[in-house]
Amino acid sequence: MKKEAYEVEYYEPKSVLAMQADRREEKHWRKQKKGIRAGRILLGVAILLFWEVSACLGWIDDYYWSSPSLIAQTAIVQWKEKNLAYDIYFTSMSTIGGFLAGTLGGAVLGLSFWWSKTFAKIFEPYLVMFNAIPKLALAPILIVLFGIGFSSKVMLAFLMTVISCALATVSGVENVDESMETLLYSLGAARWQVFGKVVVPAVLPWMLGSLRINISLALAGAIVGEFIASGHGLGRMVIYAGTILDTTLVWVGVIVLSLLAMVMYFAVVELEKWMTEHLAIYRKA
């Protein structure tokens, strides 16, 4: 009777010196991260101080450049009157609505290129053509079709993001492992099972990679729509302030827009990390 041989893998535990080295490296990395954060804060404070001092000493014309203190006072007044809060809400909802609709629509459109090769061959030239169209040029048409309210801003943000996500998804579809598809088909898997187990996990990283760009494009689309015609929003605030030559209010809108863009960007980064972790768990399942 033959004895079956089994291979046993042994994992050599880390030495004490190696563990200490890892801890030192981790500690160094934490200190470096704290230093980077502190550097960012100090740089921002230094810019604001230089700006304020320059305005007070007359180095710059505060009629055009205003000053941080005047901008803060104007922002507080606008916030108390609830104008600024609602404008932030309006722009945020327009951006998020267009971003979600564009990402979902682009993902469905891109994945359909795998599901139907005939559809892909028919639609691909139109996808390329529409990608070449400057979407912001469509803003006046969207204003006429959907009015100056919320819908036109969402539609413009949607158009800014849907093609970007679709192209990223198509790139992922083109890089799906065909040998894995063939293997599952040979084992009797249905088409929807191959789609769920092979295609979607392979395409998701490409889709996630487009999210950071899409949130910026969606915000740009919403703002341009507000520039052209809108009753609310940060873009409307900036245009209105410009028409009455209130440069301080213009700076309030610009700074709040910058902060809003930063918050949205980092929120998408955290969403991307969370989805990447769950994608890894899904692949192991």
Which residues are covered by each model-predicted region?
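Membrane-topology segments of multi-pass transport proteins
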Residues: 1-35, 77
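N-terminal signal-anchor/first transmembrane alpha helix
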Residues: 24-55
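Periplasmic/extracellular loop-to-transmembrane helix junction in inner-membrane transport proteins
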Residues: 25-33, 57-100
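Transmembrane-helix boundary motif in ABC transporter permease subunits
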Residues: 97-127
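C-terminal transmembrane helix and the adjacent membrane-cytosol boundary/short C-terminal tail
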Residues: 117, 252-285
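Generic hydrophobic transmembrane alpha-helix motif, especially the helices
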Residues: 128-164, 171-172
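Short helix-to-coil transition segments within interhelical loops
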Residues: 133, 173-179, 183-203, 243
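Transmembrane alpha-helices
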Residues: 155-159, 192-225, 252
